[in-house]
Amino acid sequence: MKPLWKGPIKDGITQSLLGKFLACRERFRLKIYGLASENDFDAKLQYGNMWHHCEELYSGGAAWSFIHESLLEYARSIAAEYPQCSPDIHRWYRVCACQFPVYIEHWQKHPEQIEKQPFAQEYTFRVPYELPKGRKVLLRGKFDAVDIIDGSYWLQENKTKSVIDHHQLSKQLLCDMQVMFYLVALRQLMQQGIEPWGQVDRIGGVRYNVIRRPLSGGKGTIVQHKPTKNNPAGESEDEFYARLQGIIRDDPSSFFARWRVAIVSADIDKFELEFLIPILEQLCDWWRYIAHGTQKYKYLHYRTPYGLWPMTTAYDELLDYGNTGGLTNIANLFPEL
């Protein structure tokens, strides 16, 4: 059985795959050989994916009527993949469908929209990154958006969260793997003069665009009214989501927030030296052992034990008992691209 992946130099690495390598080398090996869990549905993640789907269409100029129709088709595709989770998927589709139009209304009238110059939306990058040993790894990913503000590039990060915590997100930024990985890639695009990125010569920082998920605790966490003596029919599904939309519309600042965090070149340098370069050098050496059997690198391969590995997964059923139930074969390691 051959791996789907041709290694970090030929096929490149995304921050998502790098995170899997960091978490457990053996489970990562199973992943690159095309094995994935069948039952890995995550409602929070899927809501974020629904929101991202809407953002991508909206940034391309689509009207809400088209976005809404496309969102429904997208939700149906998720339900086809996870039929046992259809009620959850329908619920979060309805939440997204009532929240996103209020989001559009809110930011259309906000001055923040006027001062930025949109530069790139949903930009897929594949940029060579030279390591100290001379090897060139391909950094891969997709920017949500990059804008020009006051003559600098600002990376936009869209986040769906149960709570909007300005302090926590800003505090962890300098060692946030996804954001800093993207900033490294952005700087490489600029420095290498890859079109169209040579127009601006500095990075201003990160612009957070945070959306609070309703029905996740706090304001907006409501329940559908049950039938009563005075209202035998109770509250219909449409009435419930209309009420939720009204709560969001009456207090949009509790559900939508944007702010900037400035970054200087030394912050990116620090992330590269303390994390990215060491882990990518290890990844390249580890791959030489996995793909070519280079024995001097065999001790870079290990299985992370329980306790550090958060849960028992379908991978562990295979590793512990040889049971392949719950695993499926995949053909693409980069579905997000």
What do the PLM-derived regions correspond to, one by one?
Residues 1-337:
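RecB-family 4Fe-4S metal-dependent nuclease core
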